[in-house]
Amino acid sequence: NPDQPSQGEYRVSLTYEEWENAVETLCEHTLSTFGWETSGLISQEQVTLPDSFGPTYEGFLSLQEEAGFHLSPYAGKTVTRYTYGIQNYPTGEDNVYADLLVYNRKIVGGDIRTASLDGFMTSLVYPDD
């Protein structure tokens, strides 16, 4: 019966707000695991990934793979992008953000970026000094 948990599996009933809090906690923990300190959640929004990742996305996919993510299975899917302020970018630069892509309460991608015109985008892996 698909509605019954299998052996060793537990099902928990949570409200929407409890799920959102759990996902935000997961995001914050993930960023911390990579070495990032955040100023908290800035925004979250639904975004649809492209149906296919052509040559334009090679650099972006490479950043994802560097951090252990593989976005190809999520092509065409609508994900939630959680954006956090980053407080400890090694150069001390301001206005640095972390974006995490979440699909069905699972983090499937992310990056570190700045919003400035001459900005950058890197993987979630904390840069070596």
Where are these regions (language model features)?
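Mature extracytoplasmic domains of secretory-pathway proteins
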Residues: 33-93
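Extracytoplasmic electrostatic interaction patches
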Residues: 75-129
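Accessible peptide chain termini
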Residues: 1-2, 129
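Intrinsic structural disorder
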Residues: 1, 36, 68-69, 96, ...
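Intrinsically disordered, low-complexity N-terminal regions enriched in serine/proline/glycine
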Residues: 9, 15-18, 33-35, 56, ...
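N-terminal, intrinsically disordered, polar/charged segments of Gram-positive cell-envelope systems
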Residues: 2-40
